[in-house]
């Protein structure tokens, strides 16, 4: 969404451009999951029997919240053409879901559902970036990314974005990197987008999705060894970003 204006591709054209790199990332992820976790020697079991699906307790509530998700996705896609703001789409979907719970299961609505700490943290990151830009972040990103519109520039953009994402967060990292990419270099800009989406899996704060995942792991008392997380994330960030950028350039 942050990249929509600069990339300047219609929804279908953007999906067609990114589809193959996305498949490359998924393939790399599956290979690494097999290497690190799915192999018989690693899992310690002969077979894996998945648990039975949880039954739907309230089909009306399930349908209403499902409709809220579809509304959100539809509004995002429509917003590319109509200018609907992300905040408006998110608010509308949230209102539908909250009203549904208020009618069907009011006890489920509680302040603890809102990730207040993460909201403050991410907001703070966006405030930090302008300060860092005043002290040379823009110059540093331009030096790292360069102006080459070819393969070297694409690789530099992807890995610079991935690196800064793991230091700060991928949202401000993309904003900082975007300003360093020359306007005509579309492949370099898409490579930056790839790096800031595939790469931030090394540190817990690399992306909002990872922060939310860690938060729910904590709530459910699921222990995540930090050493394993960092090592596996490093391998995935490097190989996944390289594969995605390679396919992006080959299919461009």
How does the language model describe each region?
Residues 11-22, 56-61, 78-91, 110-115, ...:
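Interfacial loop-to-helix junctions that mark the boundaries of transmembrane helices
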Residues 3-4, 9-60, 198-252:
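Juxtamembrane and boundary regions of transmembrane helices in multi-pass small-molecule transporters
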Residues 24, 59-62, 66, 120, ...:
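Catalytic cores of large soluble enzymes that bind and process phosphate-bearing ligands
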Residues 71-187:
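Transmembrane helical segments that form the transport core of multi-pass membrane transport proteins
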Residues 1-7, 159-185, 189-220:
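Alpha-helical membrane segments and immediately flanking helix-loop junctions
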Residues 26-105:
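Long, contiguous bundles of hydrophobic transmembrane helices that form the permeation core
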Residues 4, 17, 21, 25, ...:
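Alpha-helical transmembrane segments in multi-pass membrane proteins
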